[in-house]
Every structure is written in C-alpha cells, then in structure tokens.
C-alpha cells in the first residue's frame, strides 16, 4: 500500500502539481530507500482529475509491471532533485503585445510567502484536504497572526521584491483586462435578432406603406408598371380566409424610417410575393382597414351605381382599391405608366388596342372585359371577383375623353350584383359586417348602371392630373 502511494506521488510531480517548487533538492532526498518516506516533500494534495491522470498513465504503461521497483523511484527522485525547474520556460500567454516575451509574475507579498510555505506543509500532513478549504483556513490563520508572527514573512517578501527588481528592472505590472465578452456578445446579438425577426415584418410593412400609408400624388401606382406582381400560381385559387389579426398588428409595425427610406430611394417598393403568404397579407390589409371610417368609405362606394362621387376620389380610396384587390389574391386593375399614355384616339383603334390589352395581361382566366372600346389608357387584368371593377372605377388621368365614345356601360356591367359588391368586406369582423350589408340595395342599381347618360364630361375634368 505504501508503495502504491509513493508511486502516485512520484508520478504526480512531473505531470504538474500546482507548485513545482516542491521538487526542490532539499525535499527530494527525504524519500527513503524502502519507499515508505512518510514526510516526503513530493506529496501533494491530489484532486480527482489528477488521480484520474495518474491512473490513466499507469494503464498506458506496461501491463505486467504495475509497480515500479524501488531503484526506479530512487533514480527518478535523483534526476528531479538535480534539475533546476526555474529554467523551464513558462507558457506564453496569448495576450496581444506580450506574445514574444514570457510572462513575468509579480513578486510575492507577505501573505503569499506564508500561504505557499504553509500550504506545502499542510499538504504533506493532510494529503486529502481540499485545496479550496486549505486556502480558506490559511487566510483565517493569517488574520489571526500578530505582528511578531508576521515579521519573518514580511522580511522574506521584501527580499523577494528586491530580487525581482534586480532580475526584471523594466518590469511593469500589467494586469490582464477582463474581457466583457458576454455584454459585447449580447449587444452584438441584438441587431441581428431584430433583422431576423423583422424580415417578414419588413415585407409586410413595405406592402402596407405601398398601398395604404405612403401615397404620393406624383408617384404612379406601385402596380402601374404594366405587369402583375403576383405569380400566376397564387392568383388562381380563392384567398386564404384570415383568422383574427392579433399578432400581425404588432409584426407589421416596423420602423417608419426604413419604409420611408426604401420608398424614397426606389420610388416603387419591390415585393417578392413568392415569399409572402397570401393569408398574411390579407391579415395585414384587413387589420389596417379598421382605421377607415364607415361613412368615409361610403363616399367611395356608389351605393346605387351612380358615378357622381367619382370626382371625390382621394389617395385613401385609391390605395384601398388596390389593397382590397391584392388581398383577395387576384391582380388589381393596372393602369399604364405615364410614359405610355396615348392621346384620345378614334373608337376603332381604341377597340383593337383594348382587345389586345385585356387578353394579354390576363393569364389567369378568360378576360372579363373583352368588349371595352373605351379603355384607351386603362387595361384590366382578369378579376375573378368582378365587384372590384364596379366598386372602384379606375380613374387615373383626367385627359381621357369618355364622352366621345362611351357604350352603354361596360364599367358598370357588374354593378347589378350589388350584393356581391360588399362581399369583399367579409374579411371584416362580424360586428362591422352589417354596416356594409345594410347599404346594398340591388333594385335601383341594375337599371341605372346601364344608362349612358351618367358618363358626363365634368366628372373627369374636375380631377387634377397626378
């Protein structure tokens, strides 16, 4: 048993006990020839990790020679006692500027002199004493010492300080700066997290500001570049009926600076509808539509098909029409950009132009407005929900002369379905739905919508050119 203990002691010392000074020449010869040196200076307090290292090294050694003979241990102690361990280079700390120079320790103060000497002695006597408990006890004992007891340690510390000053004349104490890694990391993670979470919110905010909030009169419609921005795959089916828009309200509120900047630079926000769920867009639009007053909305919706209120169209009604049409999953009516605007032409040429326009820009199904000789500058894509065309007639420029060649009513051909006129607002809450269904009166709207006398020139001349 004693031989096993000494084996662990000798093995432990080169592996690296905390204090290499315990291998000094004065302490090494105390190992007796019989291997049972009780007061051996090589004994340190082995922690559980160090014991594991020792056992692993024993297993890695020769399997048949479990115990080293006495002559081997004596040779090891003789070699270790003759070696000056101060010549071993210290590990270089990767500390910025001090990569080339080895780290120089501070000279020990009086307490460190006492603690090191007492730790060595106590570790010899009580090898299983835990290092932390040992440190606590040494600190308590040092505070209980009087001045006469502390004097030898103070003198030794002073001697060490003078020696240190001679050895390192240009020594300067440079404590390692404590890196605030966690705080900096937390600050660095915050913006990244915002952008990750705000990705979908930014898209929805671009959409919202494009259609409802940020309408400049000099800008064209964001959908006025002549090609529908919906992929045709999404335009086929009916829209996804949204649930109660609670979370979309918060996620849609991105910072207005971002929206204003993108609209100011680009002029037209580019929305990748391939990545946006139609259901989310419907939530967003319908949750923002609650800000519209019902009475304000009624002045944009002609209740009996009479277009007398067309002159009072504003930016809100314009944005509302395109937002409603997009929310239903279908392309809204698309007005041509200002550069393509043609002067008023004779009815045959206009008829040919309108036929080409309506059939080419409507890939989703059969065009609804194939008999429009009057759409000189306005092309309709196919609308599966035809009440949008009747609810929001597309007035974008005042120079269209509709009184010259106006047929009996292609625009209000669907206005007879006044009950379908308000089905767009079925996305609203049930508390708001009766406000719209009460207005629908299908009896007067049918005959009035087909009379050509309602298309009068002053309605369009009162509009200012955008």
From Swiss-Prot:
Chain intervals for the UniProt region annotation (Dimerization (DIM)): 62-102
Biased composition (Basic and acidic residues): 160-173, 254-271
DNA-binding region, residues: 104-172
Record-linked Gene3D superfamilies: High mobility group box domain
Polar residues bias spans: 440-466
GO molecular function, one term: DNA-binding transcription factor activity, RNA polymerase II-specific
Region (Transactivation domain (TAC)), start-end ranges: 353-466
Record SMART domains: HMG
Post-translational modification Phosphoserine, affected residues: 24
Keyword hit for Phosphoprotein: yes
Domain notes: The transactivation domains TAM and TAC (for transactivation domain in the middle and at the C-terminus, respectively) are required to contact transcriptional coactivators and basal transcriptional machinery components and thereby induce gene transactivation.
Protein name: Transcription factor SOX-10
Annotated organism of origin: Rattus norvegicus
UniProt gene name: Sox10
């Amino acid at each position: 048993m004693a031989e096993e203990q000494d084996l662990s002691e000798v093995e432990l010392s080169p592996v690296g006990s905390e204090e290499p000074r315990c291998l000094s020449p004065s302490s090494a010869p105390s190992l007796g020839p019989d291997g049972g040196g009780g007061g051996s200076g090589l004994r340190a307090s082995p922690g559980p990790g160090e014991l594991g290292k020792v056992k692993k090294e024993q297993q890695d050694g020769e399997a048949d020679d479990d115990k080293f003979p006495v002559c081997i241990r004596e040779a090891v102690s003789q070699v270790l006692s003759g070696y000056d361990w101060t010549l071993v280079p210290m590990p270089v700390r990767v500390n910025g500027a001090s990569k080339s120079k080895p780290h120089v320790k501070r000279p020990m103060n009086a307490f460190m002199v006492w603690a090191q000497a007492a730790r060595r002695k106590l570790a010899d006597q009580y090898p299983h004493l835990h290092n932390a408990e040992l440190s606590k006890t040494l600190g308590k004992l040092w505070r209980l010492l009087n001045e006469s007891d502390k004097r030898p340690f103070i003198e030794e510390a002073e001697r060490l300080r003078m020696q240190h000053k001679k050895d390192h004349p240009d020594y300067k104490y440079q404590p390692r700066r404590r890196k605030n890694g966690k705080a900096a990391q937390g600050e660095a993670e915050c913006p990244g997290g915002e952008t990750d979470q705000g990705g979908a919110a930014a898209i929805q905010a671009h959409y919202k500001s494009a259609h409802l909030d940020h309408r400049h009169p000099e800008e064209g419609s964001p959908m006025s570049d002549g090609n529908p921005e919906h992929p045709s795959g999404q335009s086929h089916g009916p829209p996804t009926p949204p649930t109660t828009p609670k979370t979309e309200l918060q996620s849609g509120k991105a910072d207005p600076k971002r929206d204003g900047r993108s609209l100011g630079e680009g002029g037209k926000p580019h929305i990748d509808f391939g990545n946006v769920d139609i259901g989310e867009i419907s939530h967003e639009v319908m949750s923002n539509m609650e800000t519209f007053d019902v009475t304000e909305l009624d002045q944009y919706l002609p209740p009996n098909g009479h277009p007398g209120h067309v002159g009072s169209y504003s930016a809100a009604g314009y944005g509302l029409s395109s937002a409603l049409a997009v929310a239903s999953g279908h392309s809204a009516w698309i007005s041509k950009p200002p550069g393509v605007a043609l002067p008023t032409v004779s009815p045959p040429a206009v008829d040919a132009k309108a036929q080409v326009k309506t059939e080419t820009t409507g890939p989703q199904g059969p065009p609804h407005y194939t008999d429009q000789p009057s759409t000189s500058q306005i092309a309709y894509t196919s609308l599966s929900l035809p009440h949008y065309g009747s609810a929001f007639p597309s007035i974008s420029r005042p120079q269209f002369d509709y009184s010259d060649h106006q047929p009996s009513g292609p625009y209000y051909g669907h206005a007879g379905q006044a009950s379908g006129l308000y089905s767009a607002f079925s996305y609203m809450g049930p508390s708001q739905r009766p406000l719209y269904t009460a207005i629908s009166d299908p009896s007067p709207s049918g005959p009035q919508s087909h009379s050509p006398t309602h298309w009068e020139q002053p309605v369009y001349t009162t509009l200012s050119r955008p």
